[in-house]
Amino acid sequence: MTLKWHIIPTGRVWVDPGGAFGLVPRSMWQKHQPPNQDQLIPMDLNSLLIFSGDKVILVDSGIGDKLSPKAMEIWGIEWPEGTMLENLKKWGVKREDVDIVINTHLHSDHSGGNTRIVDGKIEPTFPNAIYMVQENEYFDATHTNVRTRATYLPEN
């Protein structure tokens, strides 16, 4: 069986460099990724589109577009290369064509595109897909605590 895969841009967020670089000294990382005037760096979000036989598989669905305007401003969300659905269309894939969505984990920047809002109601973005995630991750996402509550959104 032949696999064909493509990187699908799903957005960009602006984040504190500490999360990306941890203990690496600023003098080292800023040569490669200078921060903006707010001391934030861009983090591009990507999904993986896989064609496997007659199956269309999406690994992670990106941040989606359901966040409030305030949340979008806080995260600095942008779509410089278009939205996930626009980028899937470039490969001839409509949302109805996706057979499987594999979530590596359920943080919003990876699973926000699992659902969308239509007429004020949440519905699956990929209506014909089977959505998959590790059992332990699903448990963590549905049993949040004060530390994890903001990272797992029920609507995703």
What are these regions (language model features)?
Residues 108, 112, 130:
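Phosphate-coordination/substrate-recognition cap region in phosphate-metabolizing enzymes
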Residues 111-121:
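Metal-dependent catalytic neighborhoods of phosphoester/phosphodiester hydrolases
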Residues 69-70, 113-115, 142-146:
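A short secondary-structure junction signal
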Residues 62-64, 107, 137:
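Catalytic metal-binding/acid-base residues of hydrolase active sites
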Residues 79-93, 97-109, 125-156:
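Metallo-beta-lactamase
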Residues 3, 11-90:
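Conserved beta-strand hairpin/beta-sheet module of binuclear metal-dependent hydrolase folds
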